[in-house]
């Protein structure tokens, strides 16, 4: 069978043969050019594969940046929400902050050492839970059925859980690699003390949230703080948000001043560097100052003051904290018993109370007990509570005729500026008196006591009324309750009645010390007094149309903050009592002790607040190690080594934002508790721990990055992965092992003996039950 071929097909076959022959001849004549063409094809293929791999990596990076924070946040919410309502009793400081939340819902004024924002948020949680504020959260009591305490706890736990995504994004902004960011985020998510505190109605999670937010915002701002982006919208956005976060942190607890100082250090360094940059004009440099003054000073102050304005507006009824404010402020509270008497003060007939206008305030007080040393006469103190021993009566000065008490009520002697008087204590019949004897505590001033009676005494009983200010439009020469500020000068000793702010020892019932100041300056409010209550059966009541002047917000704001400071300074350890919950600063980073947060009987779940060994111990080692790292770099810098070349700005940024500033943050939040005199507790380490974990993760990043260089061997890359897998597993495994310290240990304490890692942990022992 023959095969026929069409002419066109024949031509095609011939052309193909010729092409093949031509190609073969070219390859034979120019073999090196053919090799180069093959190499070009290989390079093109490699570039294509590289581009595809790069696109894949970028896609995975984008997926990770979305998926990872979601996963970590979900984990954080789970460990904090799980078993959150299993203990239906008031746990630990819920007794304080739950009660403060109730005051907001009842609008009753109260006093506390902390600023109001966190407690107003507690009140908000109660409002959202449908609670009416009628319960005072007695310690250890079971929650009534009408209080949805679970919702209130969930509200607080949300602040704790939201620290985790902020930690993730902070790690990214600082410059951590993906695995280091995961490690840092997991440490925050599974830190036992964070989880435990996040389950209850407390302020610590709110404080931590706003602290973490401040660190994130200023880390984010740092990445826009360069010449190409300065004063851009994002630059302004993040510096303003940093200021808002600072204001919120300080409005929860005054500990926020520590993170404020950290941002201040960063700002000073930044402005100093800009000052030495000759490319920045003076106009632009001044603009940098202006921006920071507005965003980092004025905005936080505004937020802080705004929280107090809302605080005053919400608490418009008389409550338990009235005595810490001025008499005029108290009189303007609804339901107050202050300020209801006559508007004039008269000799003998007016039974008055005297309120000091100094920092510690208090009402002038006396009782039958005497000073153990000095004159050994009847004690005179200041007292913050209502008491009949706070009452005083004006009498004529020693040497003048006694006031006629035969029943003539028409001859009224009003108290006026410059008048010489005696002050008699009606409960004991003795006169307010001073003499050349040192005060019991403040030895440089004169002692004030009560001495004699109506007929027995001497000229040192005499005092001169000096009116300093009048807040109303009434007769400026007369003494008026609430609105007249005055001093009392002893004629013989030439000194002024005042308070020191010092607390007397136990023999003085821990009441305030009263002295006679030898040389006070005229505006010293410790020597200023006003009449708070005025009972007088002879004088008519205040006119119906009379309205007390309102106090000014600024004055109330300053006074309340001074009162908060005074109360905080008074929280010193009592050597005569044992505080089983108190601890020393060195015990926190070492996990030497924790806190039993509730009763330790078998009937209720028990919570032991302590840090996780996997996060606290590692971060403590990290802080110590970092001090040596800084010393190492300083020595090398002194020897003119360049460890942070300008060609690698990422290394310097990572060192500063991941190491130096977090180290400052740890020191600022930890060291003050080592030197302050007030009583301290484990939860005071909560913000400092966050910075310590940042320092530790920087060290992990710094070391591990050397194992993951592009030209690293497979063994190095395997070791790199092993380090992170090991650390992540350690953090997760440690939390899981100790999880019921945070989730609640049910049954007898002996069943949980295996969780007692150190002998000092009071998990299963009978001590301090």
UniProtKB/Swiss-Prot annotation:
Record's protein name: Dolichyl-phosphate-mannose--protein mannosyltransferase 2
Function summary: Protein mannosyltransferase (PMT) involved in hyphal growth and drug sensitivity. Transfers mannose from Dol-P-mannose to Ser or Thr residues on proteins. PMT1, PMT2 and PMT4 account for most of the protein-O-glycosylation activity, while PMT5 and PMT6 may specifically modulate a much narrower spectrum of target proteins. Essential protein that plays an important role in virulence.
Species whose genome carries this gene: Candida albicans (strain SC5314 / ATCC MYA-2876)
Localization per record: Endoplasmic reticulum membrane
EC identifiers of the protein: 2.4.1.109
Keyword field contains S-adenosyl-L-methionine: no
Pfam families: MIR, PMT, PMT_4TMC
Disulphides: none
Catalytic reaction annotation: a di-trans,poly-cis-dolichyl beta-D-mannosyl phosphate + L-seryl-[protein] = 3-O-(alpha-D-mannosyl)-L-seryl-[protein] + a di-trans,poly-cis-dolichyl phosphate + H(+); a di-trans,poly-cis-dolichyl beta-D-mannosyl phosphate + L-threonyl-[protein] = 3-O-(alpha-D-mannosyl)-L-threonyl-[protein] + a di-trans,poly-cis-dolichyl phosphate + H(+)
Keyword ATP-binding: no
A GO-annotated cellular component: endoplasmic reticulum
Sample GO molecular function, one term: dolichyl-phosphate-mannose-protein mannosyltransferase activity
GO biological process: filamentous growth of a population of unicellular organisms in response to neutral pH; protein O-linked mannosylation; single-species biofilm formation on inanimate substrate
PANTHER family (alphabetical): DOLICHYL-PHOSPHATE-MANNOSE--PROTEIN MANNOSYLTRANSFERASE, PROTEIN O-MANNOSYL-TRANSFERASE 2
Lineage, highest ranks first: Eukaryota, Fungi, Dikarya, Ascomycota, Saccharomycotina
Glycan-bearing residues: 8, 132, 226, 324, 408, 453, 462
Membrane topology classification: Multi-pass membrane protein
Family matches, as PROSITE patterns: MIR (PS50919)
Region (Disordered): 1-44
